[in-house]
C-alpha cells in the first residue's frame, strides 16, 4: 500500500458547485487502476479540500499521474495551492489497528 494526501483551496467556485464536481468525478476515480480507495476531504472552516488516496503501490500512483484525469484535475483553474504528500505504510501497526493492508 502507498498513501497520498492531496490538499488545495477552492478559487472562484462555491463549495456547493465543488461538491457537484466531486459527484461527477467519483465514478472516474472508482475506475482508476491501482486505486484501492479515495476519501474525499472538506473543511469549509479553513477552506481546505482534497483527498486521501490509498494506492496498491507507488507505481500505480505514478501511472495515474500520467493520465488525462489527473492532468484535468491538477490543472483545474478552480483548485489553488495544490499540495501532495506521499507515504509508505507501516504494515505491522497498521494491521493491529485494523487498517487496510
Where does each model-flagged region fall?
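Short arginine-rich
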Residues: 71-76
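Short S/T/G/P-rich N-terminal loop/turn motif that feeds into the first structured element of a domain
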Residues: 1-48, 58-66, 77-101
